[in-house]
């Protein structure tokens, strides 16, 4: 598990064009925490579990920023994602994920 609080999409962009300072810090921290990984070529499936301290957190808000950072770190294109499984768990903040070839 990556021990970082998932960032809400609401805190990622100012207006429609500019990444917030909070997003840039999150991107730097998350990128440093992501493990080395070889992403398979072609169609892929991504499984993600977001762990939140608060049960009221929305499951979909951290998804876009997280996927964008994964793409940047691992060099794949989101058009190659054919399956996406997202789960929410309540506990300590964190993110678990796996990427599989289909």
What positions do the PLM features span?
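Acidic, proline/glycine-enriched N-terminal capping motif
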Residues: 1-102
């Amino acid at each position: 598990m990556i021990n970082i609080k998932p960032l809400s999409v609401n805190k990622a962009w100012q207006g429609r064009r500019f990444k917030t300072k909070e997003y840039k810090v999150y991107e730097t921290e998350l990128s440093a925490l992501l493990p080395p990984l070889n992403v398979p070529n072609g169609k892929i499936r991504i499984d993600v579990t977001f762990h939140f301290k608060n049960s009221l957190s929305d499951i979909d808000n951290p998804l876009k920023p997280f996927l964008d950072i994964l793409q940047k770190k691992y060099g794949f294109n989101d058009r190659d994602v054919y399956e996406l499984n997202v789960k929410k768990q309540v506990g300590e903040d964190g993110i678990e994920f796996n990427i599989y070839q289909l």
